[in-house]
Structure formats: structure tokens, C-alpha cells
UniProtKB/Swiss-Prot annotation:
UniProt cross-references to Pfam families, sorted A to Z: YpsA (PF06908)
NCBIfam families named among the record's database cross-references: PRK13660.1
InterPro entries in the record: YspA
Species for this entry: Staphylococcus haemolyticus (strain JCSC1435)
Protein name as catalogued: UPF0398 protein SH1465
The family this protein is said to belong to: Belongs to the UPF0398 family.
Superkingdom field: Bacteria
HAMAP family associated with the record: UPF0398 (MF_01575)
Length: 187
């Protein structure tokens, strides 16, 4: 397994509006934990579409991991040109900083936004060009990843593609363990 697509909720879908929110710390720690497992299995590339939330936090984790794993690569495959144009200035600056660190950048559609079909085609592109997806999504809290999950399940049923769908129970267990370990270190 050489290439993984990581996706999930957008930050506002998790009611996270600041990068210094404690939830971001725990989500990034969880993403790092997951990626380290796959690095041990030969992971070389992490791909994202460049969406706010899980995807950009994943990019930040990959950039940090490169200190210890310099062969790890980050690819950003956007649906179309200018996908950040409606974002506020702070989010655009964050994206641009991450984009400068990417090893590969490309858009599936070499046009501006034309319609929702661009997102669907980009999702399909990601499935066709990766070995696995890590999807942070829970059926209990619907959000934008539900559309991708449907496509992912259909794709898995037709191919030998693999995925790791992370529900809130797994996240909560990880966070509880992490907090317990932190509490133990203070005793």
C-alpha cells in the first residue's frame, strides 16, 4: 500500500472554527497515529483534495512527519482551479502555506467551478489513483462525507480497494486513552 487518500468532515461540520481548538490537537494526533501505522506498511504518498478540516489537518500532520520520514510525500488534487476563492483570507493563507509544502499539486478539472459533477469526478479520481482511503465519518453525524462514503462503498464492492472508516467511537477511545496517558504522566 503506497498511496492513501485521507478525507472526512470539514471543520465547520465538527463545530470547529479555530485551529487552536483542543479538538484539532486530538484530531491531528489521531491522524498521525493512523498514518504512522501505514508508514510502517510502506506508505509513500498521502493525497487530499485540499478541503478545510480533516484534509488540511492531515496535510499539516504529513508536513510534520516529514522531519522523521523524509520520503513521505503530500499530494493535493483539487476538483477545479480556484477552489479556495470563497474562503476567508485566513483560511486561504493557511491553504497556500500548506500548498507550498506539497510535493505534487494538480486539479482534476482545469477550469473554475462549473458544477457539483466536478466534486464527484474528483472523488472518483481519488479512488482510481490510491490504494486505500482513510475516511473520518460517522453515520450518527451526517455531513458532506456521506456522498463520498456512498461512492466508496460502491467502489469497494466492485474492486479490491480497501478503506479505514473511522467512526466517533474509535476517535473517542483514542482521545480517552491519550488523556489517560497524559494524566498518568502528571502523577
Amino acid at each position: 500500500m503506497k498511496t492513501v487518500y485521507v478525507t472526512g468532515y470539514k471543520s465547520f461540520e465538527l463545530n470547529i472554527f479555530k485551529d487552536d481548538a483542543p479538538e484539532v490537537y486530538y484530531l491531528k494526533a489521531f491522524i498521525k497515529h493512523k498514518l504512522l501505522q501505514y508508514i510502517d506498511e510502506g506508505l509513500e504518498w498521502v493525497l487530499i483534495q485540499g478541503q478545510l478540516g480533516i484534509e488540511l489537518w492531515t496535510a499539516e500532520v504529513v508536513i510534520d512527519l516529514r522531519v522523521e520520514y523524509p520520503d513521505l510525500k503530500l499530494g493535493i488534487i483539487t476538483p477545479f482551479y480556484g477552489h479556495t476563492s470563497k474562503w476567508n483570507e485566513q483560511n486561504q493563507m493557511k491553504y497556500n502555506k500548506i500548498a507550498q509544502e506539497a510535493d505534487f499539486m494538480e486539479s482534476v478539472h482545469h477550469t473554475e467551478y462549473e458544477g457539483p459533477f466536478q466534486f464527484k469526478q474528483t472523488d472518483q479520481f481519488m479512488l482510481d489513483h490510491t490504494d486505500m482511503t482513510i475516511l473520518i465519518y460517522d453515520e450518527e453525524q451526517e455531513g458532506s462525507p456521506k456522498f463520498f462514503k456512498r461512492m466508496l462503498v460502491d467502489f469497494i464492492n466492485k474492486t479490491n480497494y480497501t478503506c479505514d472508516i473511522v467512526a466517533f467511537d474509535e476517535l473517542t477511545d483514542f482521545i480517552n486513552d491519550m488523556q489517560w496517558e497524559q494524566d498518568q504522566s502528571f502523577e
